[in-house]
UniProtKB/Swiss-Prot annotation:
Region of interest (G5), ranges: 146-148
Annotated region described as G4, given as residue ranges: 116-119
Record domain KH type-2: where: 194-274
PROSITE patterns: G_ERA, KH_TYPE_2
Gene assigned in the entry: era
Higher taxonomy: Bacteria, Pseudomonadati, Campylobacterota, Epsilonproteobacteria, Campylobacterales
Residues holding GTP: 10-17, 57-61, 116-119
Membrane topology: Peripheral membrane protein
Protein name as catalogued: GTPase Era
InterPro entries: G_ERA_dom, GTP-bd, GTPase_Era-like, KH_dom-like_a/b, KH_dom_type_2, KH_sf_prok-type, P-loop_NTPase, Small_GTP-bd
Biological process, per Gene Ontology: ribosomal small subunit assembly
GO MF term (any one): GTPase activity
Protein family: Belongs to the TRAFAC class TrmE-Era-EngA-EngB-Septin-like GTPase superfamily. Era GTPase family.
Segments for region (G3): 57-60
Length: 289
């Protein structure tokens, strides 16, 4: 019996959240085409035979001078030391530069290099990319390919991961999908709805806070606030006649319902907290680190 923690690491938009959702066969992590959508660590539990793998989705590695982004980067780097194994995701169309930047961080834990999105490339191109990464073979414990759209890639990857995990009793009940508090997942779904329904800088200067969750027979009631930095942003989030916040609510509610399998009542309001994304105290309070 093995049980251990695996940090999913990669650049922004490398598909880390989609990777975790695919392994779980369930959506718990935020997915967006916009950069830096993942702000909090989300854990997912995958059973592979008698072995238990606890995956952690992390913010993407990138370069930025903004306080909020520096906090996210620091948490991703910290997670590399808090795990038993690292899985580094390298999209098949990328060159090796992001992987080389990862190696420059001198990760202490062993890692598996996973070439993702291989369904988007020909076999010849995949083999060519594998050859390019072979020059780093003394750095990684294994090199595998993966596609979230083709389930045949899942089992070989899980088997390889389990080879590198320690012998240990289960950390969690094998029936659990995630040890992450459901409020954290709900707020991530609201944030995803913000990313999908607003453009420009507004999503990056906004976040969500769950005020309360009430479980009633057949329905989950959620009361939440969207935090943003400026009054003009509040007006844009609400939209003309409340149309934008209505779209955000509908989008988020569908995501939550798919996870909870209950009807969901979601009440959103918007709160202005000036400069929250630039102040360490506010960042820690709102993002939760």
């Amino acid at each position: 019996m093995k049980s251990g923690f695996v940090s999913i690491i990669g650049r922004t938009n490398a598909g880390k959240s989609s990777f975790l959702n695919a392994l779980l066969n369930e959506k718990i992590a935020i997915v967006s085409h916009k950069q830096n959508a993942t702000r909090r660590k989300i854990n997912g539990i995958v059973m592979n035979g008698e072995d238990q793998i606890i995956f952690t989705d992390t913010p993407g590695l990138h370069e930025s001078n903004k306080a909020i982004n520096q906090l996210l980067i620091s948490q991703a780097i910290k997670s590399m030391g808090d795990c038993d194994l690292i899985v580094f995701l390298a999209p098949i169309h990328d060159d090796t530069s992001d992987y080389e930047k990862f190696l420059a961080l001198n990760p202490e834990k062993p890692h598996i290099l996973v070439l993702t999105k291989v369904d988007e490339s020909s076999n010849a191109k995949v083999l060519e990319k594998i050859t390019k990464y072979q020059k780093f073979q003394d750095k990684f414990a294994a090199l595998l390919t993966f596609s979230t759209k083709q389930p045949t890639y899942k089992k070989p990857l899980l088997d390889e991961i389990c080879k590198l995990l320690p012998e240990h009793e289960y950390f969690y009940d094998p029936e659990f999908l995630t040890p992450t508090n459901e409020k954290e997942i709900f707020r991530e779904f609201i944030l995803e709805a913000i990313y999908e329904n607003l453009s420009d800088e507004i999503p990056y200067l906004s976040d969500a806070i769950i005020k309360s969750v009430k479980e009633k027979t057949g329905i989950t009631e959620i009361y939440a606030s969207i935090i943003t930095e400026r009054d003009i942003h509040k007006s844009m989030i609400i939209g003309k006649n409340g149309e934008t916040i209505k779209r955000i609510g509908i989008f988020a509610r569908k995501l939550i319902q798919n996870l909870t399998n209950t009807k969901v009542f979601l009440k959103l309001d918007v709160v202005v907290k000036k400069g929250w994304s630039k102040e360490e105290k506010s960042l820690n309070q709102i993002i939760g680190y």
